Each structure stands twice: as C-alpha cells, then as structure tokens.
Amino acid sequence: MEETILTANALKFRYDPEQPTYALNGVSVGVRRGEFVAVLGANGCGKSTLAKHFNAILLPESGKVYVEAMDTADDSKLYDIRQTVGMVFQNPDNQIVATVVEEDVAFALENLGVPPQEMRRRVDESMKMAGIYEFRERAPHNLSGGQKQRVAIAGVVAMRPDCLILDEATAMLDPRGREQVMQTIHHLNKNMGITVVSITHYMEEAAQADRVIVMSKGHVVMEGTPKEVFSQTEKVRSLHLDVPQAAELREELVKAGIPLPEGIIDTGECAQALYELLK
C-alpha cells in the first residue's frame, strides 16, 4: 500500500464563524507520497483554503488534517509540518526578501541555523535544480516573473521538504514563464521524489498530473486521473471550468464525424490518433 503523506478527514472551515457559509464543507482527500496532484475549481471553490490547511497556515473548524500522521492542530508539530510541506504562492515578488538571488535562497536556512558548509551545498544544489544557478549573483528584481518564481521554489526546496504545494504559482506568469516553472516542478517530482500538490486554473498543467481533484463550493465533486476527469467534458464545463485544448479539439472532431477514441487530453495523443486514421 502506498503511503499517504497528506490527509484531510471531514474537514470544515469558515473564515467567519458568524456566517453560515463554509469555505470547506466536509472535505476528505488524501495525497500519496511521490504523487503529483492538481486541484482545480472556479474562484471561491475552496482550493486555496485547502492548500493552506496542508501547511497549517489555516486550522480546521472541525475534522482533521494530517501531514505524515502529524495533526496540524498540534502546536508542538508545527515546525515539523512546515519542514515537511513547503509552499510557493502566486506572486513571486511577495516571497523574495533578499537583494541577491543566492542570499534569498539561503534566507530560511540561515534562520534555521544550518551550518555554513551544509548551507552552501544546499543552496547551490537547489539553484542548479531550479535552473537559476547562472543568476546566483543577480538582483531578483532584474529577473523575469518565471525566473523569480524559480528563485522562490529553490528557496523552498533548499529546506528539503517532502511535499511542495503550489498555490496558483504560475497564475501571474507569461506562457514561457509558466513552462519554465512547470519543467522545474516536474523535475522535482519525477527525479527527486517530491510530492507535488498544484492549485491551478490551467487545464494543460492539470493534464500532466497523476491525479486531478475538482472542487466546487467547498466540496470535492470530481476526482480521478486526468483522462477520467477531462473525458467528462460536459460535467467539467458545468463547473465553470475549461477542458484541455486537445480534449476540446477531439470533441469537435467527433461531432464532425471523425471517430477519435475517448480520453485524448494532450496534443501528442490527438496528433497520433489522427495519424492512425489517415495512414
């Protein structure tokens, strides 16, 4: 049985206890170690609220959240939880605190009292992993949005987390910046074994995940592999979400009488299916 690193059991949360509306209303989900999970949903669905529970930024009103069996409501476990789960937010400018890239990556390690030699090794490894080593002596404000976000990721990865949560970390980036960041994230997941939970509204990003969770009005309403979720195009659209462009193209071609198989969610699959029909 695969080990579960993040668990929410019957999680309920309101930002205002005086109001009847729950941001999370009975959410039960689990994330397995080494998995890449994308969490989707329209604005206000509760996806970012869920992400903040996995890092103990927010605590349940009722129900439980566990990080490697540590209860997030246990104050004595807070340090260990945040060592286990790192978080990268939407705006990279809000996460950068130093005037030189390598100093920013080292910032948290300095606060933890990591010995200088170990710190140097971790900082260099993290910058190389994130593809920013060549910028190590540059000022962060001179970097592009995608490069800044990779600086933020390197700073988190230097802490050696087992899990990385991205709270719409590519939302403010241009297409090239998004591509750079996602390449880095996939490298962390596939080559370093870091569990990834990506809160996103980009369907093409979600299509590359191992599993997709869809939320609506504080509930989990869909869950499965990208193929299982995005094959249900009508249901996905009813939740005010798009589907990957390849899935949309496949749908239109089928309507035009071209018999393409179900489950096509990326352009490579779509091109291969068309090639098989034409050869």
Where is each model-derived feature located?
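Catalytic Walker B motif of ABC-type/P-loop ATPase nucleotide-binding domains
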Residues: 164-167
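The feature captures the beta-strand-to-loop junction immediately N-terminal to the Walker
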Residues: 40-42
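Helix-to-loop junction immediately C-terminal to a conserved catalytic motif
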Residues: 55
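Conserved ABC ATPase signature
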Residues: 139-143, 147
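Conserved ABC ATPase "signature" region
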Residues: 117-135
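Conserved ABC transporter NBD signature motif
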Residues: 63-73, 81
